[in-house]
Amino acid sequence: MKIIMTGSTGFLGSALVESLQKDGHQVVRLVREGGASGTDAVFWNPLSGIPDTSALEGADAVFHLAGENIVDGRWTAERKHRIMNSRVIGTRTLAAALSELESRPEVMVCASAVGIYGVNPDGAVTEDSPSGEDWLAQVCVEWESAAALAEDADIRTVFMRMGIVLHPSGGMLKRVLLPFRLGLGGRLGRGTQPMSWITLRDAVSAFRFVSETDSLSGPVNLCAPENSTNIDFTVALGKSLGRPTVLPVPPLAIKLIFGTELASSILGGVFMDVGKLLDSGFTFQDPNLAQASPMLGQE
């Protein structure tokens, strides 16, 4: 298969590229000027366009993962602007380019996030649940809506509403490993807030699965089937490392580091129902923390 990918140098993107290439698929990477290069790279500007779309012709699938890191610092007005534009305008730019191809891809799989549901500690949300009212939920709603041109061009479009992707090599887990290894890790706030997570290998498998499953379209919740709280994760990681986890991080400290708005998202969350993905035949390798924990503390 010929596959187009944005965000190919990111945490999830690089793992997905490796998996696809290992199985013999051709991956064409859309990269920014000054970014990664190579014979498989096509330059684009997410905010303005793709100068040469000929390399996209004849693709079977598109994986769209590009976007400004949401939790990498306080949500200042400038960062909010970059986060929103990188997702909304970037998605609209890509969808427009795909819609104008003579030979269009069958499917476009877009990253989205659990943040679309806002904060709701009661019950598990499904893909039909209403979106939240906070700023992050608004970003996710506009992010998904920006792919309308692809849908209008009869490209099957899937939005992967992901929880936190876990692997020691990157993402949130890499950031917290050192304090946990030093015995300084602990729950965030009360620790009772929902924490929707998925291991990196399951995320890669799920993206590939939905691209190959014609019956799946629209939003798809993506996290481990087991409902977990922050304290559940904290205990599992401490056990994996053989270290105590008795030093909680107070809410005030999180607010001082990240600002009130981002802190509210960190200290909140939702449980997600993944019945749509399970009913379509997907099998998780790490459906719960007990099975994922050996990986959590790997070097």
Where are the regions a protein language model picked out?
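N-terminal Rossmann NAD(P)H-binding glycine-rich loop of SDR-like oxidoreductase domains
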Residues: 3-23
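NAD(P)H-binding glycine-rich loop region in Rossmannoid oxidoreductase-like domains
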Residues: 35-90
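Conserved Rossmann-fold NAD(P)-dependent oxidoreductase catalytic core, especially the SDR/UDP-sugar
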Residues: 92-134
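Conserved beta-loop-beta element that borders a ligand/cofactor-binding pocket
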Residues: 112, 145-168
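Glycine/proline-rich active-site loop of Rossmann-fold NAD(P)-dependent oxidoreductases
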Residues: 153-155, 166-175, 209-220
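A conserved pocket-lining segment of Rossmann-fold NAD(P)-dependent short-chain dehydrogenase/reductase
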Residues: 175-198, 202, 206
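Mid/C-terminal beta-alpha module of Rossmann-like enzyme folds, strongest
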Residues: 213-260, 294-299
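C-terminal amphipathic/interface module of NAD(P)-dependent oxidoreductases
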Residues: 264-299
